[in-house]
Amino acid sequence: MLDSVASKPELAELLTLTKTEQILRLAQINVELEPLSAQERVKWALENLDGEFAVSSSFGIQAAVMLHLVTQEKPDIPIILTDTGYLFAETYRFIDELTEKLNLNLKVYRAEQSAQWQEARYGKLWEQGVEGIEKYNKINKVEPMRRALKELNVGTWFSGLRREQSKSRAGLPILSIQNGVFKFLPVIDWTNKDVHYYLEQHGLTYHPLWEEGYLSVGDTHTTRKWEPGMSEEETRFFGLKRECGLHEDDGNEQDGSGI
């Protein structure tokens, strides 16, 4: 079935095109990737897209799915974490647990200034409205991620975003180009039920805060526990934003939990 997917796309050539031209050029490949399983998509990407390869993970609620899925095919693939210094204690323990359980090749990137230095210089940016949140995300998520992609010489970036998670992700394709590299989303069409079954099947767990009512987990100061009547999007960034920037294509980027 993998052989039926269109021929290997050339990143260097695609980078000479406009964004619209890139989308059109990759459209047929995306059509042919849609009916494949997530495992088949990962295999196709590893065989046909530019390396080096890497996975970005926020080690959020469903992070174990993507980490397990890709490392089953490429055990030594770098796992990029952008650490803000404000993650939950449970998240740091979850990182340690999954790193040991899956033998992850974890690469941690941080902002050039410490969290304390940033607060001294700018105040609490996350309390300064959308503009403050975007500046915070640029410093703590976007810049470290771009540095990681460059230093690791990444040609293809795997991420666990899913269309079901938010309106901003609903129209995303499996394969695109972002920050000058291929962006590949093998579980983009998975439902929460698909995620649950995969975790059960492979003896994996949700983030520990799942049991306490969290649907999405990021920094302690911009993550809220889900309450009746709230959408998943409203549990992050006070409902002002869904994305932290890592997955937005205009240079401000989009993360949040992904997987």
UniProtKB/Swiss-Prot annotation:
Q: Which CDD domains match?
A: PAPS_reductase
Q: Name one GO cellular component term.
A: cytoplasm
- UniProt entry keywords in alphabetical sequence: Cytoplasm, Oxidoreductase
Asked if Oxidoreductase is a keyword of the record, the answer is yes
| Keyword Oxidoreductase found | yes
Looking at its record, which EC class is this enzyme? Answer: oxidoreductase
- Reaction(s) this enzyme catalyzes, per UniProt: [thioredoxin]-disulfide + sulfite + adenosine 3',5'-bisphosphate + 2 H(+) = [thioredoxin]-dithiol + 3'-phosphoadenylyl sulfate
What is the protein name stated in its UniProt record?
Phosphoadenosine 5'-phosphosulfate reductase
Native species: Vibrio parahaemolyticus serotype O3:K6 (strain RIMD 2210633)
